[in-house]
Amino acid sequence: MSFSTIVKDELCRIELHDECCMKSEILGVILIGNLFSNEKILRNTKVVTENAAFARRIYSIFRRIYGICPEVSIRRSSKLKKHVSYSLTLVPNQMINKILYDFGISAFTEDEYIPAASTLEKVCCRKSFLRAAFLSGGSISDPEKTYHLEISTHNIMSAEMIKDLLDDYNINTKIIKRKGSYVAYIKEGEQIVDFLNIIGAHGALMELENVRILKDMRNNVNRIVNCETANLEKTVNASIRQIENIKYIESTIGIDKLPENLVEIADVRVQFRDASLKELGEMLHPKLGKSGVNHRLRKLDEIAERIRKNNQR
């Protein structure tokens, strides 16, 4: 089961008790689902969905609010995966004008959908509209792979309406045109969490948050491992360089020609190739800190470099 299906199934279990919220969900279905269509004289309304729970929800709300029992037909795809789709049709003359009047919609053409400003005045109604918008045309990617939530609409006005509503919640929504549709989408994980909270998908929200936490932990572990690997590589390379310089000094002027403190550090460096600066300092008499050890080893590097330059003349 896809994550989109999980979210939609959860949303369909949310019970509505207020008529205003039920009407707001119907508005979401109308605008986002492109519910109305013109067929010459007859005016038909139809919504098609592959989600059985959403089909039942639409049927129930229309029956409770308008006393309409949509005609339901089921279609099974002949393709390999055999998808099942549910079509709900409101036949002509079944209070269609009443539905339009409630939403301030005066025409069937997509560019003239004008919902009444008061329809989404309440916070609960705005949430109901956004919930229905996602149920009608929304999808969300598997959070294990990427963060992406979108709602596909059939007209720019509907997409902009969604964007305006989400702007009020400080959710950054962008709109793109894709194959004749207008898609409002969200890309940031934290803002997708906020959207799921608004529409009431709290179970899916927690699942997404868990995934985000695990991904953050994995990323942090990877950063730490990469940092430690880089530091280890740096330490190994430094050790190799230091030992080469010590051997070069020994083969040219001899280590015993150096001050006693440099002879001592050269001796432990050669004996303990994998030791850190701190560990080398612990082996000296008296003990020396990391900065002191590093200073002496740099002195050996400088001496070796001077000898090389003199030999090249």
Swiss-Prot record:
<keyword id="KW-0132">Cell division</keyword>
<protein>
    <recommendedName>
        <fullName>Probable cell division protein WhiA</fullName>
    </recommendedName>
</protein>
<dbReference type="InterPro" id="IPR027434">
    <property type="entry name" value="Homing_endonucl"/>
</dbReference>
<dbReference type="GO" id="GO:0051301">
    <property type="term" value="P:cell division"/>
</dbReference>
<dbReference type="Pfam" id="PF10298">
    <property type="entry name" value="WhiA_N"/>
</dbReference>
<dbReference type="GO" id="GO:0003677">
    <property type="term" value="F:DNA binding"/>
</dbReference>
<dbReference type="InterPro" id="IPR003802">
    <property type="entry name" value="Sporulation_regulator_WhiA"/>
</dbReference>
<keyword id="KW-0238">DNA-binding</keyword>
<comment type="function">
    <text>Involved in cell division and chromosome segregation.</text>
</comment>
<dbReference type="InterPro" id="IPR023054">
    <property type="entry name" value="Sporulation_regulator_WhiA_C"/>
</dbReference>
<keyword id="KW-0131">Cell cycle</keyword>
<dbReference type="GO" id="GO:0043937">
    <property type="term" value="P:regulation of sporulation"/>
</dbReference>
<dbReference type="Pfam" id="PF14527">
    <property type="entry name" value="LAGLIDADG_WhiA"/>
</dbReference>
<dbReference type="InterPro" id="IPR039518">
    <property type="entry name" value="WhiA_LAGLIDADG_dom"/>
</dbReference>
<dbReference type="InterPro" id="IPR018478">
    <property type="entry name" value="Sporu_reg_WhiA_N_dom"/>
</dbReference>
<dbReference type="Pfam" id="PF02650">
    <property type="entry name" value="HTH_WhiA"/>
</dbReference>
<comment type="similarity">
    <text>Belongs to the WhiA family.</text>
</comment>
<feature type="DNA-binding region" description="H-T-H motif">
    <location>
        <begin position="276"/>
        <end position="309"/>
    </location>
</feature>
